[in-house]
Amino acid sequence: MMDMKRAFNVIAIIGKPRDPNAIKTHLSIYHWLTDQNYTVLLDDRLREALPEIPADRFNHLLKLGELADLAIVVGGDGNMLGAARVLSRFDISVIGVNRGNLGFLTDLDPDNFEEPLQAVLNGDFVKEERFLLEAEVHRHGQVKSHNSAFNEVVLHPGQVAHMIEFEVYIDDTFAFSQRSDGLIISTPTGSTAYSLSGGGPILSPNLNAISIVPMFPHTLSSRPLVVEGKRHIKLCISPENRTTLEVSCDGQVSLPVSPGDEVHIFQSPSRLKLIHPKDYSYYHILRNKLGWSSKLF
């Protein structure tokens, strides 16, 4: 029975059986929640790693999105990206427990999750919505493939690194043509990921904006460009490109692109509902993860 006084009633634990420490974290959170009489469901990918948990507690990610009102993602930012592309379709809040490297998207310490997570369960948290991008590959006027990205959509060569040629249109207005190793189209969330490595700007996560970052352009005048989030970006791939290219979504999903194709990138109607502990500060995260200097006085 649902407790209307609780901020959340059905909680899903999501992740992959990466290593023994991650499995230990999944199990600790599961028992800690069940001891408080929460209904707890788990990612089906954890079934074999957690044989002591009843089989009916496990389900696939789409079903967890339907059934749960809070998802706890255990792992690094990669796990959060994969979960975000699915869970953004549902009315579910998401928080992360960091078992990865940088952890821009995963707030909770796996060894000390109890106190901050208890505060979140009590309704004491910060909530924000992050948008995703949709990527479509068009060929001869038809959509051949599509997917979504929480961080970035990247146009790049296939198996062999080489220059590629393409034109960029924004809302069907020609912006520029380019010969480069590719192009990164990033959300504000992704501005601290691959885009940052490519020299792109850091965008505050609440900005409704998209950054367009060239990858090793064959010109000295090319610079990153930030456009309004509602703009429709179209990449026209030159027929002169000799090999098949690729569009990568979050570095996890790859769509083949042929010479002469068009790639359409636009804001998804879906939003991921991220929640953070009450003391969350985006600028503290930047200072901590990027090694910025502390206050002088």
Curated annotation (Swiss-Prot):
List cofactor names only: a divalent metal cation
The record lists the membrane-crossing segments as none
Describe the reaction catalysed, as an equation: NAD(+) + ATP = ADP + NADP(+) + H(+)
InterPro entries according to UniProt: ATP-NAD_kinase_N, ATP-NAD_kinase_PpnK-typ_C, NAD/diacylglycerol_kinase_sf, NADK
Cite the entry's keywords alphabetically. ATP-binding, Cytoplasm, Kinase, NAD, NADP, Nucleotide-binding, Transferase
A GO CC annotation given for this chain: cytoplasm
Which GO biological process annotations does it have?
NAD metabolic process; NADP biosynthetic process
The family database entries (Pfam families) matched by this protein are listed as: NAD_kinase, NAD_kinase_C
Q: Where is the active site?
A: 77 (proton acceptor)
* Chain positions recorded as NAD(+) binding sites: 77-78, 151-152, 162, 179, 181, 192-197, 252
Output one GO MF annotation.
metal ion binding
Q: What does this protein do?
A: Involved in the regulation of the intracellular balance of NAD and NADP, and is a key enzyme in the biosynthesis of NADP. Catalyzes specifically the phosphorylation on 2'-hydroxyl of the adenosine moiety of NAD to yield NADP.
According to UniProt, the name of this protein is NAD kinase
